[in-house]
């Protein structure tokens, strides 16, 4: 038998030591005893007793030996020891999958497998020792933190501490990607703070709380950690194998995670996102995350598999269950206190429009409570941008926008979802980790004033979450898919040649370069005709572009049935052009008024910001004005030109590159206009569902009549935010002048649509002139 690779550092000193050895097989007993002999050979004066580590579930009577050892001397050290079985190097995907089967876990080989390992590769058997602690220190910690009452309770506590110490030692060997919490349920249930809070909930019992903790538990194992990348790759097999990272961001995040626990808040466009985050952490050898997911995804084999991969399933509706809310809050607090990382979508659900949704505060409130309660010196909110060249889910989103129903999750749905991933090449996945947001910076020090001031705390949470979302937006790279889709949506079904596409896209690329906006490699390749051809061909066959190549040269366009799918991609890039689009519309508005045009320009820019605030993220008012001034500064003496006559503004718009408001924002104001039109004869207090149904009907009529530019405006998703707009404008609640104010609002939207038409006219005339010169 070859010599095992044992850890023989002198962890046993001359002090009186109790060695708690976890050894269940003859091979493990022999390895541990050999290790102890080596310890004695290195230090002949050491004094120690060896006791087999009791099982956590043993009856109190079985703990007698440990109780006696702990009572013998308060100053003696306790050192936990066990054999760590390393898995074989370079295991295949199949071997990793087999590791979940009974008797195949490489980290816990059976007796026969252990003998085989010692004969063939004994270096995989490593004796490890956890950090030591004095009995007196353990006893004090036990008294301070648990509800234990007798020596048997203390012995069970020491057993748990020993197991956790050995887990930490093994994690240091394997790497941070294997770090995961252990013994969460017994640790929480035994804690003094948990029991104290439980007593304040009427009718709450430890047994019921334990069941809820079981429901939240992940069942994480090292074998399942190895499987994370395999599962993630299976779900994303339609994408290129290499995820696109910013290595500088990864390095910065690695340093930050070494200092504080973090909550990774990711943008959410696809079910794949929940798999991408764990894969990204593992590929970059970063600590794993516990991803929160709705319990609706815990079905069939999906539930156990995801749990073992670190997913925490939570109930959707918990408002009327104080015990569940308390258990969830304490669970989150325990995780961050032990410096493990959590993750969920900051938007709370998938964005079916491609835009960032407003942040949800629910789970974040629990994390803030844990921080303010002093369970961590700081907690980092790590923004995570996840974006894709293409998604197969756009077809589902388009159907939903047209009024269809959401497909319920289940076995059939899962099969279809996984099957769809292999139907074609969806391009690349992009993951970005912008600078983390410090909870301490926004909430102040733990135990501060926000503990008592709930209104101030909520405001701070809102500002903090919006900052996270803003950093996600700023870090998300613009893709070729988004730019091409935005361009072809403006033609309203008219096909463009390769040269037309290439020439028109250059203005947008120039703008992005000037603004130093992050762009993908596919977007950079749009500088060449070959790059444009690759981009439109990748989207052809109705995904969402159609190519016609039966004539002299191929042309590309978007059919009416694919407008909603194309809009999903276009919407992902609007944030990069939002303020420059508002400049165009404010200029066009000032062009059509008499009087102080500068005053009108600024008033309209702020008004557009107010109307669009439910669809897009904006900087605060002062920063927004500064950004607008920067955007319009492309023209020297712009203040004088805006204050001049209409011809000066025309000249400014003619020289602006790009003119893009029509491509980016028209559809949203058309949706608002449809809702405002429906409101003319809708009753007061009309509900969102009823108003949406009416708007869908009227919108389809207007598309047929050509009164709106495309069917893209007729969308349940856009009407949902349009409803928020009219509520914000006080156009729903009963009032004596309600009908009049509804008409005024509708006229305002018609004026804005006129401004779109004016900008589009200039852009179209410029396009025609360029085409004429090129022939």
UniProtKB/Swiss-Prot annotation:
Keywords: Acyltransferase, Cell membrane, Lipid biosynthesis, Lipid metabolism, Membrane, Phospholipid biosynthesis, Phospholipid metabolism, Transferase. It is a peripheral membrane protein. It catalyses: sn-glycerol 3-phosphate + an acyl-CoA = a 1-acyl-sn-glycero-3-phosphate + CoA. Its EC number is 2.3.1.15. It comes from the Bacteria. Pathway: Phospholipid metabolism; CDP-diacylglycerol biosynthesis; CDP-diacylglycerol from sn-glycerol 3-phosphate: step 1/3. Transmembrane segments: none annotated. Belongs to the GPAT/DAPAT family. This is Glycerol-3-phosphate acyltransferase.
């Amino acid at each position: 038998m070859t010599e095992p690779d044992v850890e023989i550092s002198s962890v046993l000193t001359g002090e009186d030591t109790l060695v708690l050895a976890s050894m269940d097989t003859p091979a493990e007993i022999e390895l541990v005893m050999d290790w102890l002999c080596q310890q004695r050979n290195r230090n002949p004066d050491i004094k120690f007793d060896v006791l087999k580590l009791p099982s956590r579930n043993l009856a109190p009577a079985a703990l007698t030996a440990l109780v006696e050892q702990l009572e013998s001397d308060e100053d003696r050290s306790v050192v936990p020891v066990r054999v760590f079985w390393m898995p074989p190097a370079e295991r295949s995907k199949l071997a990793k999958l087999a590791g979940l089967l009974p008797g195949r876990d490489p980290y816990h080989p059976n007796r026969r497998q252990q003998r085989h390992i010692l004969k063939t590769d004994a270096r995989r058997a490593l004796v490890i020792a956890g950090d030591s602690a004095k009995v007196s220190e353990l006893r004090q910690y036990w008294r301070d933190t648990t509800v234990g009452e007798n020596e048997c309770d203390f012995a069970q506590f020491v057993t748990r501490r020993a197991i956790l110490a050995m887990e930490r030692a093994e994690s240091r060997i394997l790497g941070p990607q294997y770090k995961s919490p252990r013994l969460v349920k017994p640790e929480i249930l035994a804690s003094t703070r948990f029991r104290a809070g439980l007593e304040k909930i009427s009718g709450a019992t430890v047994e019921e709380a334990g069941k809820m903790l079981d429901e939240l538990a992940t069942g994480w194992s090292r074998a399942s950690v190895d499987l994370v990348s395999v599962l993630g790759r299976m779900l994303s097999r339609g994408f290129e194998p290499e995820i696109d990272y910013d290595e500088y961001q990864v390095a910065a995040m690695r340093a930050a995670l070494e200092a504080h626990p973090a909550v990774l808040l990711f943008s959410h466009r696809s079910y794949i996102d929940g798999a991408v985050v764990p894969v990204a952490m593992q590929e970059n050898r970063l600590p794993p995350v516990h991803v929160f997911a709705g319990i609706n995804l815990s079905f069939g084999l999906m539930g156990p598999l995801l749990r073992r991969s670190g997913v925490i399933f939570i109930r959707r509706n918990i408002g009327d269950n104080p015990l569940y809310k308390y258990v969830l809050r304490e669970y989150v607090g325990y995780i961050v206190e032990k410096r493990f990382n959590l993750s969920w979508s900051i938007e709370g659900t998938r964005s079916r429009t491609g835009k960032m949704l407003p942040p949800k505060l629910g789970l974040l409130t629990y994390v803030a409570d844990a921080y303010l309660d002093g369970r961590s010196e700081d907690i980092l909110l790590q923004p995570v941008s996840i974006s894709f060249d293409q998604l197969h889910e756009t077809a589902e989103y388009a159907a939903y926008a047209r009024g269809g129903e959401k497909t319920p999750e289940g076995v059939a749905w899962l099969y279809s979802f996984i099957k769809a991933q292999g139907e074609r090449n969806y391009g690349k996945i992009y993951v970005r980790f912008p600078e983390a947001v410090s909870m301490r910076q926004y909430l102040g020090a733990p135990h501060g004033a926000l503990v008592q001031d709930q209104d101030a705390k909520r405001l701070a949470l809102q500002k903090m979450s919006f900052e996270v979302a803003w950093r996600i937006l700023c870090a998300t790279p613009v893709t070729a898919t988004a730019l091409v889709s935005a361009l072809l949506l403006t033609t309203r079904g008219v096909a463009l040649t390769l040269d037309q596409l290439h020439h028109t896209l250059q203005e947008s690329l120039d703008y992005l370069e000037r603004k130093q906006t992050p762009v993908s490699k596919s977007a950079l390749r749009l500088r060449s005709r070959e790059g444009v051809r690759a981009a439109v061909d990748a989207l052809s066959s109705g995904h969402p572009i159609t190519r016609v190549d039966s004539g002299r040269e191929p042309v590309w366009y978007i059919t009416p049935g694919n407008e909603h799918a194309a809009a999903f991609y276009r919407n992902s890039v609007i944030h990069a052009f939002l303020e420059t689009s508002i400049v165009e519309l404010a200029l066009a508005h000032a062009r059509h008024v008499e009087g102080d045009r500068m005053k009108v320009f600024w008033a309209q820019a702020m008004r557009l910001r107010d109307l669009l605030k439910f669809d897009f993220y904006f900087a605060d008012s002062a920063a927004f004005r500064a950004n607008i001034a920067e955007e319009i500064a492309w023209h020297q003496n712009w203040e004088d030109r805006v204050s001049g006559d209409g011809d000066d503004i025309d000249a400014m718009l003619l020289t602006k590159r790009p003119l893009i408001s029509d491509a980016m924002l028209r559809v949203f104001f058309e949706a608002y206009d449809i809702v405002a039109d429906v409101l003319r004869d809708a009753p007061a207090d009309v509900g969102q569902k009823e108003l949406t149904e009416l708007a869908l009907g009227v919108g389809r009529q207007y598309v047929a009549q050509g009164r709106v530019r495309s069917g893209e405006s007729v969308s349940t998703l856009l009407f949902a935010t349009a409803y928020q707009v009219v509520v914000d404008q006080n156009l729903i609640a009963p009032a004596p002048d309600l009908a009049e104010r509804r008409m005024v609002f509708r006229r305002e939207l018609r004026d804005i649509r006129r401004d779109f038409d004016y900008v589009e006219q200039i852009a179209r005339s410029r396009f025609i002139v360029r085409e004429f010169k090129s022939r």
